[in-house]
C-alpha cells in the first residue's frame, strides 16, 4: 500500500504540470486560449478578487493587525477545528469492530473494511456537486453533518442489530465529504486580499491539526475498542457545533457580501 501511494504521488505531480491551469498572471496555455484567459481575469475583477502576482505574502505588523482585528480568522478557525474533530473514521473503529466479531480473517477484515471509504468517495462527489448544482453550500454541509450525526447516534447506542452498525460505519465518511465546501467557502470569504487569505488558511489548518493531534489520543483510546462511546459522543458534539457555526458563517458572509 505504501509503495502504491508513493508511486501515485509521482503521477499526481507530473499530472499537475500538465493539467493545472496555473494562476491568472501565469496561466497555462495548454488548454486555455487567450480569450478564455482574459475572460477569467475579467470575472476575477468583477468579483473583487486580486489577480496580481502570486508571490508569497510578506509578514508585517500591518498585515497581522488586519488579520487579527477581523472576525474571519477567529470564526473560520473555530469552524475548521470543529470540522476536523467531528470525523471518527480515522481511528479504525470499523475495522476494530469487524475484527471483534471473530467471523473474518485479517485479510477479510481489510477487504470488507474498504466499503466505508469506497462509499466515502461517492459522498464526496455527491456533496460537492450538490453544493454547486442543487443544495448550495449551507444545504450540502447540513446534509453531510446530519448524516454523520445519525451515524454517531447509532454507534453511541451500540446495542443495536449488526445491520444497523454496518449502516452507521458505512455512512460516517459523510462528514469528510464537506471538506471542499468548507475550504471553498472560506477561500471565497477571503478572496479580496490574497496575503490575508494565505495567512488565515495556514492558521486555520495549524490550529485544527493541533486540536486533532490530542483529541484522538484522548477520545479514541484503542483499549476501549471496539466501542468508542466517549469518542463517538465527542464526534457527535463537534458535528452539532459544525452545524451551528455554519449558520453563523452564513450570516457574516451575507453581511460581508
Regions found by a protein language model. Give the residues of each.
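Extracytoplasmic gate region of multi-pass secondary transporters
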Residues: 59-129, 212-217
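A late C-terminal transmembrane helix in Major Facilitator Superfamily
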Residues: 194-228, 234-238
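Hydrophobic alpha-helical transmembrane and interfacial-helix anchor sites in secondary transporters
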Residues: 130, 186, 222-223, 231
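Transmembrane alpha-helical cores of Major Facilitator Superfamily
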Residues: 3, 81, 114-118, 146, ...
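C-terminal transmembrane helical hairpin of 12-TM major facilitator-type secondary transporters
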Residues: 133-185
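A generic transmembrane-helix signature of 12-TM secondary carrier transporters
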Residues: 6-16, 80, 145, 149-152, ...
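Hydrophobic transmembrane alpha-helices of secondary-active solute transporters
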Residues: 12, 79-88, 116-120, 132, ...
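Central mid-sequence intracellular linker of multi-pass
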Residues: 1-69, 230, 235-257
Amino acid at each position: 500500500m505504501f509503495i502504491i501511494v508513493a508511486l501515485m504521488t509521482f503521477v499526481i505531480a507530473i499530472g499537475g504540470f500538465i493539467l493545472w491551469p496555473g494562476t491568472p498572471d501565469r496561466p497555462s496555455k495548454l488548454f486555455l486560449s487567450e480569450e478564455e484567459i482574459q475572460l477569467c481575469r475579467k470575472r476575477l475583477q468583477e468579483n473583487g478578487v486580486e489577480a496580481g502576482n502570486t508571490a508569497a505574502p510578506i509578514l508585517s505588523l500591518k498585515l497581522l493587525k488586519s488579520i487579527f482585528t477581523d472576525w474571519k480568522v477567529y470564526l473560520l478557525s473555530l469552524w475548521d477545528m470543529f470540522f476536523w474533530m467531528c470525523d471518527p473514521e480515522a481511528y479504525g473503529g470499523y475495522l476494530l469492530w469487524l475484527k471483534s466479531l471473530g467471523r473474518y480473517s485479517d485479510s477479510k477484515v481489510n477487504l470488507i473494511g474498504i466499503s466505508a471509504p469506497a462509499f466515502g468517495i461517492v459522498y464526496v462527489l455527491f456533496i460537492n456537486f450538490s453544493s454547486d448544482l442543487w443544495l448550495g453550500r449551507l444545504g450540502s454541509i447540513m446534509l453531510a453533518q446530519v448524516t454523520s450525526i445519525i451515524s454517531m447516534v447509532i454507534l453511541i447506542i451500540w446495542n443495536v442489530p449488526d445491520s444497523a452498525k454496518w449502516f452507521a460505519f458505512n455512512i460516517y465518511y459523510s462528514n469528510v465529504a464537506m471538506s471542499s465546501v468548507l475550504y471553498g467557502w472560506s477561500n471565497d470569504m477571503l478572496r479580496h486580499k490574497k496575503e490575508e487569505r494565505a495567512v488565515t488558511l495556514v492558521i486555520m489548518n495549524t490550529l485544527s491539526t493541533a486540536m486533532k493531534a490530542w483529541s484522538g489520543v484522548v477520545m479514541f483510546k484503542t483499549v476501549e475498542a471496539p466501542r468508542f462511546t466517549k469518542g463517538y459522543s465527542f464526534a457527535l458534539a463537534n458535528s452539532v457545533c459544525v452545524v451551528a457555526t455554519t449558520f453563523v458563517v452564513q450570516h457574516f458572509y451575507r453581511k460581508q457580501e
